């Protein structure tokens, strides 16, 4: 590549995106005047871990858990130093939310002029009317693996039917999305089978629908066949040792694009994403709080239409063509700075 002919470089950074991180570091060292920009998907950090642990911590890499995890924590000050070193030389860093921008700026020690917020872009999807209100159709959409809080959603739904048995015949839940084998199978066996067992134990078999490994072209149709998306995410307790994750969610962006409201935990930056009248939040891990939110939407169905209307407005404002214009402006400003 003839880097003298390049006006600006842009990268996508997130947890584990180490090739892009190392490429930016190399470019910064070799071409210190070249404008560098990046979208940071998982603030308050850039990549959260090093590609390789330094010696002698590297000895622990091939050992049994928890030794590799302990080594990662011990090496984190070095990783954080490298992240800050690069971040402070970046011309512009884009985050998807204000909360993400603030957390990244504070943790990396950045100047306000380096920061830009551009909401998660989405496809321009034709609006579709809400389906008939009975039954109320809830949707979990996203990868189906441990740590997504799906058990909380199942427990909350069972709690709703215990407290208000009359609602049982009026609500259905669909679990839709990808089930990557390496994520769905762990040391304790198949996660999908564990979910199915839990569903049987809770007496919910007749109320749960499955849409696994959904083809991309069917996503809008499936989302719009439901009333509300439910995202019960929990933040990783292991990750908290390294920092606060303040990213957002592709699933939440799909809900916005398809004009559907969301009930979500307050994990990540979700509270900001549903602060536009397009849904409601509850404290992550609070099963009773989620159950209360579900009862709320069952007993106040008019909110579903209100949320859908607000989500549709957001979706139209966030179409990729508008997002591209925002990035074009960022790139132009980055070139002017240098």
What is the meaning of each model-derived region?
Residues 29-30, 56-93:
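Membrane-proximal helix-turn-helix segments that form the acceptor-binding/catalytic region
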Residues 296, 303-317, 329:
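A short, well-ordered alpha-helix in the C-terminal region of glycosyltransferases
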Residues 131-148, 154-157, 173-176:
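Conserved donor-binding/catalytic core segment of Leloir-type glycosyltransferases
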Residues 85-95, 101-122:
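Helix-loop-beta element that forms the nucleotide-linked donor phosphate-binding surface
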Residues 224-246, 260:
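Acidic donor-binding loop of glycosyltransferase active sites
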Residues 257, 266-281:
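Short acidic/histidine- and often glycine-rich active-site loop of Leloir-type glycosyltransferases
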Residues 276, 280-287, 295-302, 316:
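Conserved acidic donor-binding segment of nucleotide-sugar-dependent glycosyltransferases
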Residues 187-220:
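Nucleotide-activated donor-binding/catalytic signature segment of Leloir-type glycosyltransferases, i.e.
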